Design a protein with these regions (language model features):
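Bacterial Sec-dependent N-terminal signal peptides
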Residues: 1-29
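Short glycine/proline-enriched turn or capping motifs at secondary-structure junctions
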Residues: 10, 14, 112-119
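Central antiparallel beta-sheet cores of small beta-barrel/beta-sandwich binding domains
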Residues: 29-96, 122
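Short, conserved beta-turn/loop elements at beta-strand boundaries and strand-helix junctions
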Residues: 51, 104-105, 126
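Short coil/turn motifs at secondary-structure junctions
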Residues: 60-62, 115, 126
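Short, exposed beta-strand-loop hairpins at the edges of beta-sheets
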Residues: 98-101, 105-117
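Short beta-strand-to-coil "C-cap" segments at the C-terminal boundary of structured domains/repeats
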Residues: 120-126
């Protein structure tokens, strides 16, 4: 009877670890893809590079924007959100950012000093 309980515990442990890894992997991939920033027609591509999640400018109709420039870096998962750094092109500075993924929308909260600003990026189909 004890051997049966040991086998049952091993199976349950394996199933738990498998479910945890699937949930963790899907959270890791939730930011990946193309995102429209809003006002300007700028598209950011979020992907893994050297085992880190980064965001690069893929396209923009704004001539001041350097296509290919990294604007999101040091992203790491913390619970239900991602934290890292975002580059403000107009100010030419890096700021802290929190990102929450909600289906087809990314909610970004950018912190600078005692102030913060919120943005929404929408999933791009192209």
């Amino acid at each position: 009877m004890i051997w049966f309980l040991k086998i049952k515990m091993k199976v349950l442990t394996t199933l738990f670890l498998l479910m945890f890894s699937i949930v963790y992997t899907s959270a890791q991939q939730s930011l990946e893809g193309l995102w429209k920033t809003g006002k300007e027609e700028t598209i950011i591509e979020i992907s893994f590079s050297n085992e880190q999640l980064i965001g690069k400018i893929k396209f923009s109709n704004n001539k001041e924007v350097d296509v290919g420039k990294i604007i999101l870096k040091d992203l790491r998962s913390e619970g239900n959100k991602w934290v890292g750094k975002i580059y403000a092109i107009k100010r030419k500075e890096w700021y802290n950012v929190e990102i929450i993924s909600k289906e087809e929308v990314l909610e970004l909260k950018i912190s600078f000093g005692l102030m913060s600003r919120s943005l929404q990026w929408k999933k791009s189909k192209s």
